[in-house]
């Protein structure tokens, strides 16, 4: 009699299940607090299967962050690329947040804090993502007609990062509302004569 392997263990889709588990657990519990055993349990794979796909937990953390980066970042960051809004509307949309949602923070900021100096590959991905997002803000500020798009893009990046961090610390979206209001003032001042 042949016994079937338990459903959902190893085999096809194991790498994807591990990445899905990492996304859920790193977001909910943190990177350091989530061990390989917890990841394999959540992904329904053996440790052997885990190590067939990822050479280390650090390797998984890097892939987790790369995946988010290539998707355009967090949903709030993806708003900068929305095709159905004006450049001004896209710059403001990054500050929008669903009311009542549990705020866990930016995965890149969280990873940078948890990585400290222990995971240089993670630091490189975090730097790349933050610089890329700022460049996208600068590009959109140019489209919005800002006289100094570099300055406006960087100001909005700092405002966004600070508002997200405070909102996460307080588990309250009101810092994002205040930041959106401040962003409106910055955008208006930077584009007052542009007509866009």
Enumerate the predicted regions with their spans.
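Hydrophobic alpha-helical connector segments
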Residues: 63, 76-104, 149, 153-156
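Basic, helix-initiating cap at the start of DNA-binding domains
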Residues: 1-29, 33-45, 59
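Hydrophobic alpha-helical segments that form the core
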Residues: 104-107, 148-169, 178, 182-186
């Amino acid at each position: 009699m042949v016994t079937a392997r338990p459903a959902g263990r190893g085999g096809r889709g194991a790498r994807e299940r591990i990445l899905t588990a990492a996304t859920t657990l790193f977001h909910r519990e943190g990177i350091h607090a989530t061990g390989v055993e917890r990841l394999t349990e959540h992904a329904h794979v053996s440790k052997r299967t885990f190590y067939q796909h990822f050479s280390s937990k650090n390797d998984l953390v890097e892939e987790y962050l790369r995946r988010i980066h290539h998707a355009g970042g967090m949903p709030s960051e993806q708003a900068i690329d929305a095709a159905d809004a004006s450049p001004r509307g896209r710059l403001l949309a990054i500050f929008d947040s669903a009311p009542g949602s549990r705020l866990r923070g930016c995965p890149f900021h969280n990873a940078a804090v948890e990585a400290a100096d222990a995971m240089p590959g993670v630091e490189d991905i975090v730097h790349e993502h933050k610089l890329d997002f700022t460049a996208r803000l600068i590009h959109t500020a140019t489209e919005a007609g800002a006289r100094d798009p570099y300055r406006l893009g960087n100001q909005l990046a700092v405002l966004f990062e600070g508002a997200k961090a405070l909102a996460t610390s307080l588990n309250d979206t009101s810092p994002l509302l205040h930041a959106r209001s401040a962003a409106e003032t910055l955008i208006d001042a930077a584009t007052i004569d542009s007509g866009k």
